[in-house]
């Protein structure tokens, strides 16, 4: 397996990074990255989250940005549809076995009330959470080829 947690968005070519993980793995890949949800977009709009990860470069002074440089990276946020299109373009002959799950990490508040509110909200609107886990099974016994 190949696993990446909150690091692909530091690449200047995040799509290529995922495809390279898939290429070198034998059994599959697991990725946990930011999701492109309405709530994430609103958080960026109201400066509760970053569109470009300036904080990482400020913290480290000379690195932590795109390709670990001093240039803040764009925080690429993913959707299920984008992952589907990526793998369908890369290996169109395969019906890919992709599983998704959602989670959240709220950095902007320590308020228990706000955290409780979001817990309820995310229970109802699961896909609005700010984290997306993606598992792509590459096990040959689970692969199905398209019937053209």
Q: What residue spans do the PLM features occupy?
A:
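A conserved beta-strand element that flanks and buttresses the S-adenosyl-L-methionine
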Residues: 3
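Glycine/Thr-rich phosphate-binding loops of Rossmann-like dinucleotide-binding domains
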Residues: 12, 38-39, 105
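A short glycine-rich, Lys/Arg-flanked "PGG" loop and its adjoining helix->strand segment in the class I
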Residues: 15-31
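Conserved class I S-adenosyl-L-methionine
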Residues: 27-60
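Short alpha-helix
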Residues: 71-101
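Conserved Class I S-adenosyl-L-methionine
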Residues: 96-148
């Amino acid at each position: 397996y190949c696993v990446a947690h909150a690091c692909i968005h530091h690449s200047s070519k995040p799509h290529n990074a995922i495809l390279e993980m898939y290429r070198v793995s034998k059994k599959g890949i697991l990725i946990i990255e930011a999701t492109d949800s309405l709530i994430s977009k609103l958080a960026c709009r109201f400066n509760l989250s970053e569109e470009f990860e300036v904080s990482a470069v400020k913290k480290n002074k000379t690195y932590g940005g795109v390709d670990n440089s001093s240039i803040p990276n764009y925080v690429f946020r993913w959707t299920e549809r984008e992952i589907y299109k990526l793998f369908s373009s890369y290996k169109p002959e395969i019906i890919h076995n992709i599983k998704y799950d959602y989670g959240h990490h709220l950095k902007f508040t320590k308020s228990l009330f706000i955290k409780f509110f979001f817990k309820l909200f995310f229970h109802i609107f699961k896909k609005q959470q700010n984290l997306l886990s993606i598992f792509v099974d590459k096990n040959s016994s689970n692969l199905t080829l398209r019937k053209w």
